[in-house]
C-alpha cells in the first residue's frame, strides 16, 4: 500500500511536534508544511529537511490529508478550504471558535465522505488506554487541570485551552445528554478567563465538577471517577490509573490486585481491592496521529470525530456563557 501523502498547516510549537512525529510514522510521506509566517515555515522546513509551501493551495494540491495546528481563529477557514478540496483532516482542539463553524465542518465532512479527527490528545493518554478492560459509568467526576502561566495559548480562554480536554473525556464517559451547566471564572493576567470552575449536570444524574487554571504555582492533571462499586483515579501527567473496586468474594482477581479489606460475611462477603492497570508505553501525540492515518487508509471512523469536537466545544461555550453572565451581574 502506498504511503499517505500528508502536510502540516501551522508550524508553531504544536505544529512542529506534528512535523517531527509524522516523519517517524512509516506509512506516511510528509510532503511539506505551510505557515502564514513564511520565514518560520522555511526555518522549520530546513530543520527537518522538508519542503515549505508558500500558499495553502499549493500544499493542498500535493497531499491526501493535512494536520491543522494553526491558532484557533484560523481553524475554520483552513479546514473548510481543505475539505472543499477533498482532503482528510486532523485538526487540533478546539475544533473551531464557534458551534456554527463546527457544524459546517461536520456537514462538509459528511457530504464529501472525508475523515476528520479532532486532537483531543488525552483520549490517547496511557492512563486512559489502561482502562480498556473496565466499564466506565461514572455518577460523579472531579477533575483538576492546573498549569503554570505561559503566554502561548492565551488567545483563548482557559476553558478552550485546557478545560476542554476534560470536557471531552467526561462526555466520552457519560452516555447521557447535558442537562445543566453552572460556572464561574476570572481573567487574572490575560484578557480572557485564566481560571474557571464548572459544574456539569447530566440527565442521568451524573455530576462533573471541573476546574482549570493556567496561573497555578504547580502543575496538576488529575481526574477522579466515582461509580457504583468502583472509584478510579487518573493522573494524566504520570500516565497512571488506579482502581479501587468492591468485588464479590469469589470473583477472580486480576494480576496485580491488592486486597484492602472485607465487607459482610458468608455469601454476602465482598472484598475491597486495589488495582493498578498496566499502562502502555506510548507517545500520545504520535499514537493519535498514527490512528488518524489508519482511519484514513482504511476508511474507518476515527476515535475522536468532528462531532465529538463539536460537542466538547458546545459544552465549553456554555461554560463561557455562564461565566460571562456572572460578570454582567457584578
Protein language model annotation of sequence segments:
Residues 18, 48-106:
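Beta-loop-alpha module in the N-terminal Rossmann-like domain of NAD(P)-dependent dehydrogenases
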Residues 1-48, 170:
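N-terminal Rossmann-like dinucleotide-binding module
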Residues 167-244, 279-299:
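Contiguous beta-strand/loop segments that form the cofactor/metal-binding neighborhood of enzyme cores
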Residues 119-126, 149-180, 193-194, 309:
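Mid-domain beta-loop-alpha active-site segment that forms a flexible
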Residues 65-67, 287-330:
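C-terminal helix-rich "cap/oligomerization" subdomain common to oxidoreductases
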Residues 96-153:
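A contiguous active-site-proximal alpha/beta segment in oxidoreductase catalytic domains
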Residues 50, 85-87, 112-115, 206:
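A short helix->loop->beta-strand "cap" motif at the edges of active sites that frequently abuts
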Residues 54, 91, 116-118, 142, ...:
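Hydrophobic residues in well-ordered beta-strands that form the structural core
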Amino acid at each position: 500500500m502506498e504511503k499517505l501523502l500528508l502536510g502540516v498547516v501551522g508550524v508553531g510549537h504544536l505544529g512542529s511536534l506534528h512535523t517531527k512525529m509524522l516523519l517517524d510514522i512509516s506509512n506516511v510521506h510528509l510532503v511539506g508544511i505551510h505557515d502564514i509566517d513564511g520565514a518560520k515555515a522555511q526555518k522549520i522546513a530546513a530543520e527537518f529537511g522538508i519542503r515549505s509551501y508558500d500558499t495553502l493551495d499549493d500544499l493542498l494540491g500535493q497531499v491526501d490529508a493535512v494536520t491543522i495546528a494553526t491558532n484557533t481563529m484560523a481553524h475554520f477557514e483552513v479546514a473548510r478550504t481543505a475539505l472543499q478540496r477533498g482532503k482528510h483532516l486532523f485538526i487540533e482542539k478546539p475544533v473551531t471558535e464557534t458551534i456554527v463553524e463546527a457544524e459546517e465542518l461536520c456537514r462538509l465532512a459528511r457530504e464529501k465522505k472525508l475523515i476528520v479527527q479532532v486532537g483531543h490528545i488525552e483520549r490517547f493518554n496511557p492512563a486512559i488506554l489502561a482502562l480498556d478492560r473496565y466499564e466506565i459509568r461514572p455518577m460523579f467526576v472531579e477533575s483538576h487541570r492546573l498549569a503554570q502561566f505561559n503566554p502561548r495559548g492565551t488567545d483563548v480562554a482557559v476553558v478552550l485551552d485546557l478545560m476542554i480536554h476534560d470536557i471531552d473525556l467526561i462526555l466520552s464517559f457519560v452516555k447521557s445528554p447535558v442537562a445543566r451547566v453552572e460556572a464561574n471564572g476570572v481573567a487574572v493576567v490575560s484578557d480572557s478567563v485564566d481560571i474557571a470552575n464548572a459544574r456539569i449536570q447530566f440527565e442521568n444524574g451524573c455530576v462533573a465538577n471541573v476546574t482549570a487554571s493556567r496561573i497555578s504555582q504547580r502543575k496538576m492533571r488529575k481526574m477522579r471517577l466515582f461509580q457504583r462499586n468502583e472509584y478510579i483515579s487518573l493522573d494524566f501527567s504520570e500516565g497512571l490509573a488506579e482502581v479501587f473496586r468492591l468485588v464479590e468474594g469469589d470473583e477472580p482477581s486480576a494480576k496485580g490486585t491488592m486486597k484492602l479489606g472485607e465487607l459482610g460475611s458468608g455469601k454476602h462477603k465482598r472484598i475491597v481491592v486495589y488495582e493498578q492497570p498496566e499502562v502502555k508505553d506510548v507517545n500520545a501525540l504520535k499514537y493519535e496521529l498514527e490512528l488518524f492515518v489508519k482511519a484514513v487508509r482504511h476508511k474507518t471512523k476515527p476515535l475522536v470525530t468532528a462531532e465529538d469536537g463539536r460537542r466538547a466545544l458546545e459544552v465549553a461555550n456554555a461554560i463561557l456563557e455562564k461565566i460571562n453572565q456572572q460578570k454582567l451581574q457584578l
